[in-house]
Amino acid sequence: MLYRLVSHIPHILFKPVYDAYESYLLEKVKSGNIPKHVAIIMDGNRRWARKLEKPPWYGHLFGSKKLEEILEWCRELNIRTLTVYAFSTENFKRSKEEVEALMNLFEEKFKELVQDERVHRYGIRVNVLGRKDMLPENVRKAAEEAERATRKYSNYNLNIALAYGGRSEIADAVREIVRDVLEGKIKPEDIDEEAIKRYLYYPNMPDPDIVIRTGGEVRISNFLLYQIAYSELFFVDVYFPEFRKIDFLRIIREFQKRQRRFGR
């Protein structure tokens, strides 16, 4: 009992300082250039669960709760588009038990989004990017219902990359372009960067200003390969469930200090 009390003393002592620094950062960020689109590779859920000697689903559950927090942070800063990498096409190679647990979690969370009054109050549109035909029918239907229920909203966009791969997205786009060329709907000489973008999973999505990867790994992992050519990349050495608002604000602040050249 005494050990538990003592172990919390540093947190109690430093919390006012921490809160003051967070408030300071928030005001600094609000006074600067706010990114329009933030994309996040939500990595480290399983390793976080393993550290706590818990099963993988436990990490994914807490990761989904962290995503809810990040949505609120984005709304507070008026970041209009958030894209998250939830499940890749390669992730289907994981154990049957983990994939099934994840699919059940996705179905549950999509249904919660439809009922969440904050989604409707703030006008958050849900878009699911990926090969939906690879998803179990119950998950696909839940995802499509979340899209239908929020289709009329335009204040904010939550893009969920599910059964997604950047190379798959480009391959699917090329396949559709070839089909339209053969059918005479588009001329080969009209194919340029913007034309290709119109064939991506969500063509109206602005390119990400920032890509954040949690979990300590320094790689892109086949995420939004066409869209992130000029994005600012940030790699954070913290598991996704432990990602803090102060980490998020520091990244936005660093983004504001960078001079983006877009290849010029």
UniProtKB/Swiss-Prot annotation:
Q: Which residues bind Mg(2+)?
A: D43, E232
Under InterPro entries, the record lists: UPP_synth-like (IPR001441), UPP_synth-like_CS (IPR018520), UPP_synth-like_sf (IPR036424)
Name the cofactor(s): Mg(2+)
Give binding positions for substrate: 44-48, 60, 88-90, 92, 94, 213, 219-221
Instruction: Tell me where on the tree of life, at the top rank, the source sits.
Output: Archaea
Q: Which reaction does it catalyse?
A: geranylgeranyl diphosphate + 7 isopentenyl diphosphate = tri-trans,hepta-cis-undecaprenyl diphosphate + 7 diphosphate
The Enzyme Commission number assigned here is 2.5.1.89
EC class name:
transferase
Question: Does this entry carry the keyword Magnesium?
Answer: yes
* Molecular functions (GO terms): magnesium ion binding; prenyltransferase activity
Q: Which GO terms describe its biological process?
A: polyprenol biosynthetic process
Concerning its family, UniProt says: Belongs to the UPP synthase family.
Give the organism's phylogenetic lineage. Archaea, Methanobacteriati, Methanobacteriota, Thermococci, Thermococcales
List the keywords (alphabetical).
Magnesium, Metal-binding, Transferase
Is this entry keyworded Ligase?
no
User: Which HAMAP family is this protein grouped with?
Assistant: ISPT
**Which protein is depicted?**
Tritrans,polycis-undecaprenyl-diphosphate synthase (geranylgeranyl-diphosphate specific)
* Protein's job: Catalyzes the sequential condensation of isopentenyl diphosphate (IPP) with geranylgeranyl diphosphate (GGPP) to yield (2Z,6Z,10Z,14Z,18Z,22Z,26Z,30E,34E,38E)-undecaprenyl diphosphate (tritrans,heptacis-UPP). It is probably the precursor of glycosyl carrier lipids.
